[in-house]
Structures are given as C-alpha cells and as structure tokens.
Amino acid sequence: VLILGSAGIGKSELALDLVSRGHALVADDSPVLTQQADGRWLGRCLFPLQDFLEVRGLGILNIRRLFGDRAICAEHPLDLVIRLEDAPSRPEDRLAGAWRDYRLGGHAVPELPLTVRGGRNLALLVETAARLRACGAGEGIGYNAGQELSRRLEEHLGKESL
C-alpha cells in the first residue's frame, strides 16, 4: 500500500498504526518504485532510510528496533494506493465506494481516497481496502458488495410486487 497525502495529514502516523497491527513498513517518505517486466511496480527503500519512520511529536523512530524484523519489508509489489484527503475530492458512490485509478507509467493501480476526520479508524479502513482489493475491488471486476445488495433488493422487491 502506498499512502499519499499532503504534509502533516497523518501518513506516518497511519503507517505506525498499521505496523502496530502486524503489517510491515517498506519506506517512509521516499519509496523507490521500479517497474517490472509485467508492468507492475515494486516498492523498496534506499538503505540509509530503511527502518526509519518520522512521526510528528515522536521524532525519528527505528521501526525494526521497536517492533522487530517482521515490521520491515525490503520490497513489495504496489497493489493499492491510499490517498489521505482533508475533504472529499469528488462525490462518492455510496454503494461502490470512491475507487479510481492511480496511473503510474502506463499501469493503473487501484486508488482509494480516504477523508481524514476525527474519530475515523484509518488503519481499519486501509486493512479493509486491502482485503477488498484482494477480492478484485478497484479493477471493475471481482466481488462488489454494493452490486450484490442492489441485486438482492431488486429480487426482493420483484417478488413482493407479484
């Protein structure tokens, strides 16, 4: 997951929350993205920056020292982009979500904008987005709960009108 957003919006704090939940950090501010032969992108961190995360108020953290080796991942394919926003960039389809494509070198990566507001559990939303992505969300294929709900309602309403 690549987390994007303006300075100070909470990207590093979200990354720290995800690490505390058992996920691994690839890079903080300067991920190196390399396009593979199949068109997909692979993210990694330059060695001098590896293991470190800067969190406002806490300073520089050595994630490997705080959470162990499992908390650092040397490289990982880019499967999902999360964009943290102060306000929604466009109206959201409440059934399908706000999925869109993040274009990178001619390759589309599913992107999900998340509005940052007090009381939202962003780590849980990112974990759920990753699960949805694994089911094909954001690709125009795969499982879509909104479509299933619409289908069930149409079937139910159709039976009642008979």
What are these regions (language model features)?
Residues 79-162:
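Conserved NTP phosphate-binding and transfer environment spanning the P-loop NTPase/kinase superfamily
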